[in-house]
Amino acid sequence: MHCRASAIPDRHPDELTTEEGRRLLEQVRAFGEPLMVFTGGDPLKREDLFELLTCACRLGLRTTVTPSATPLLTARAIERIRDCGVLRMALSLDGPDAPTHDGFRGVAGSFERTLFGLRHARRIGLETQVNTTVTRHNVMHLAEIAARVAEVGARLWSVFFLVPMGRAQAADDLSAEQYEEVFEFLYETSRRAPFDVKTTEAQHYRRYVAERRKAEGSGAAPAAKPGSLARQAGINDGKGFVFISHTGEIYPSGFLPLSAGNIRRDPLAEVYRQAPLFRALRDPDGLEGKCGRCLYRRLCGGSRSRAYALTGNHLASDPRCVYQP
């Protein structure tokens, strides 16, 4: 899914207030030291964004922000993001050139604004991340996009795999076999690239990497850098991850539209730890179909969001996995 998937032209009238945002950040900090991501939509549309970023950083939260490449992403805005103490800024890049990227985003000029944002952040010492959503329309350009990621000096390439929802339809997605081909490309890229590679909604990439490393053995060529993959191990929707919407709804992820509560009435930690939805998502033995029988169910667990989007059952097998346990 990309930012146009459930697009609305104006801000929601019932979105969280600044004070509610502050209270939310305090609840997040009570978890320990999680990574806090401000995303959207476009978080720059909130006049209090910099106030909330500063609050998060002063609370000791590792904080990142994912603005949209719009005219709001000025040099001054990027400098203010840095000055708030933000760890990293992420921007989306879905093609190696303007026709591909702007065609995907549906906004002329988005490609140039994205490159400007990434390059300016690098100039002023703000770490960057590039997010790419893989679809059948840009899969053939992944090597060129990876070259762009290296060119702009990004620290991380976060590759999103499609969850058909909103305007992102199943016809845009890859086949299960194509997923494996992309996994091979990402694995080989991660060996030599000057940046880390991370996947989102492709939990079975962990299974692919585990199988490759097992096949290579200790005497084989150097394995892919373990950093981001090791940090992802076992993380899934509602399992090491929680998403709070602009109106306070508590979801297992931004791609699984099943709410377990609302921070306006429910303590975040209580929902995360006790809500039946979250508890079910953290039980790999409760998964159905081949995911429930899979040797890698604790490492991987499949995309719960994709299972729900394509089958209506968040505990079903991930339809885009070729592995047969």
Q: Can you describe what each PLM-predicted range is?
A:
Residues 1-16:
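Canonical Radical SAM [4Fe-4S] cluster-binding loop centered on the CxxxCxxC motif
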Residues 4, 295, 304, 322-325:
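Cys/His-coordinated zinc-binding microdomains
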Residues 15-39, 45-169:
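Radical SAM/AdoMet-radical enzyme domain recognition
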Residues 18-30, 310-325:
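Short microdomains enriched in Cys/His and/or Lys/Arg
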Residues 151, 244-245:
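Short, acidic, Ser/Thr-enriched surface-loop or helix-capping motifs
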Residues 151, 169-195, 231-232, 313-325:
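A structural motif corresponding to the C-terminal lobe/cap of the Radical SAM core domain
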Residues 177-224, 249-302, 306:
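C-terminal accessory region of radical SAM enzymes
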Residues 235-239:
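Short, small/polar residue-rich loop motifs at catalytic or cofactor-binding pockets
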